[in-house]
Amino acid sequence: MAIQAQKGTKDMLPNDAYKWHYIEEKLRKISAEYGIREIRTPMFEATELFKRGVGETTDVVQKEMYTFEDKGGRSITLKPEGTAPAVRAFIENSLYADAQPTKMFYFTPCFRYEKMQKGRLREFHQYGIEVFGSQEASIDAEILSLVMRALTEDFGIKGLSLNINSLGCPKCRAKFNEALKQYLKENYDNLCETCKTRFEKNPMRIIDCKEKRCKEIVKEAPSILDYICEECSDHFSKLKAYLDVMGIEYNIDPQIVRGLDYYSKTVFEVIKDGLTVCGGGRYDYLVEEVDGPKTPAMGFGLGLERLLLILDEEGIEIPEPVRCEVYIGSMGDRAKLEAMKLAFNLRKSGIKAEIDHLGKSVKAQMKYANKIGAKYTFVIGDSEIEENKIKIKRMSDGEQFEVSLDINEIVNIVK
């Protein structure tokens, strides 16, 4: 039996690669407009980082991580998300000593052993932004403006909903958790086994449960917005004011808690037809939690597979780049040498050029050139070499002509 790709993974084939390049280039460009620079972190980290950073009661840590022991006896985990590794890098490399805020973006593969769903595999890819060093609501609004601009203006996606909430600070949450536990007590026996554990350790996680019975129970649960303190309420009001002044529409959804324990104050999700396209929020205590200095922070993750799926479903075309500008057909060994030389010089001039490497007939070479979408086809044989000329056909209109084998003249025609 042939070895196949593992369940939940997918090959990115050459015919699809340009789509990934397109969205990555768009996201790199808008990141630069906001003064955000790239970071790259390792594929795997110490398991302890995610236990402490993401939260031991989360589904990610309890059920979904790919964890193994390496040959040195260390517990290692393939990263299930990008924020905790970015925080670790921020601390380990003393980036907190630089001028703040520190703004970074990344493209990274992530790994979660979870039930596969539309636009989400077990190995998936994220574009993420993390901003360290500012506790102002203005940075939250700035990042949300980037997200909505990218999705609506750069990619042209319609029908998106930006939903926001505030999870307050630890003091707010302590009061809310007590109220939530009081509400949940009468339905405790109907909770799933995981949520029964959460009831004592972290009742807010129950709001994020995907089990149908638990989702029904929390529908009428208390709203955390009724329990946030004056400072957190002021922060949320400022966020809304900043979004209003930029003309960014939003909905307030008190049931957004996100699936990771590190969030505080602002949390958000961008929804399209019931699917979360993008989500994130503020995590003012995470840097301290993993032994760094007290540092407020804000970030989000955007699933690239899901983004590509939406673009496809919306009929938004991604322009396919020209694969081959010039195909040089040759007849005989002498002509093959000239074709090799010409292709080399064309490529040096920035022109995409190909030649035959299979010993095909000229007819078969021209058929291949047409198949790969060559803009021009050249033909070289012994007579062309003797006359120092080359036959050129412009594929768009079929016009044929001859020019000298002078590289500068050929480049001017093609460009």
UniProtKB/Swiss-Prot annotation:
Q: Which UniProt keywords apply?
A: Aminoacyl-tRNA synthetase, ATP-binding, Cytoplasm, Ligase, Nucleotide-binding, Protein biosynthesis
InterPro entries in alphabetical order: aa-tRNA-synth_II, aa-tRNA-synth_II/BPL/LPL, Anticodon-bd, Anticodon-bd_dom_sf, His-tRNA-ligase, HisRS-like_core, HisRS/HisZ, HisRS_anticodon
Q: What is its EC number?
A: 6.1.1.21
Cellular localisation:
Cytoplasm
Q: Which GO terms describe its cellular component?
A: cytoplasm
Outline the subunit composition. Homodimer.
UniProt lists the family membership as follows:
Belongs to the class-II aminoacyl-tRNA synthetase family.
Q: Please identify the protein, giving its name as recorded.
A: Histidine--tRNA ligase
Per the UniProt entry, what species is this protein from, by scientific name? Clostridium perfringens (strain SM101 / Type A)
